[in-house]
From Swiss-Prot:
The keyword Ribonucleoprotein belongs to this UniProt entry's keyword annotation: yes
PROSITE patterns, per database record: RIBOSOMAL_L17 (PS01167)
Protein name: Large ribosomal subunit protein bL17
Top-level taxon of the source organism: Bacteria
Quaternary structure (record): Part of the 50S ribosomal subunit. Contacts protein L32.
HAMAP family (alphabetical): Ribosomal_bL17 (MF_01368)
Length: 127
């Protein structure tokens, strides 16, 4: 199994990938470095595939990886509905990609970062 070390220890790398994957699920677009984006693409594709499976074991596996953050807040009069990133993954993203076999993300290259010249990209979910 090959992966990028990203200049971090294993626990730091896992935390970084969890954070970036959750942000991509919530916002559907992130700006990051090229190496990070290529790693996050892999984990995001795995999470969306788990969302498409939709069984209890898939939900528990996704819940163990995706952070528990607020994805959306909607108000209906006095009712306030708060959905988490995990709920968005299973309720919104999984049905959207139900007929797609893979390739849920797209990477666009942008200008290098100003401070150190690191190659930057926009990682987004395909419509």
């Amino acid at each position: 199994m090959s992966y990028r070390k990203l200049g971090r220890t294993s626990s730091q790398r896992k935390a970084l990938l969890r954070d970036l994957t959750t942000e991509l699920i919530v916002n559907e677009k992130i700006v990051t470095t090229e190496a990070r984006a290529k790693e996050v693409r892999s984990t995001t594709e795995k999470m969306i595939t788990l969302g498409k499976r939709g069984d209890l074991h898939a939900r528990r596996q996704a819940a163990a990886f995706v952070r528990n953050v607020v994805a959306d807040v909607t108000e209906d009069g006095e009712d306030v509905k708060v959905s988490s990133a995990l709920q968005k993954l299973f309720a919104d993203l999984a049905p959207r990609y139900a007929d797609r076999k893979g390739g849920y993300t797209r990477i666009y290259k942008t200008m290098p970062r100003r401070g150190d010249g690191a190659p930057m990209v926009v990682l987004e979910l395909v419509d």
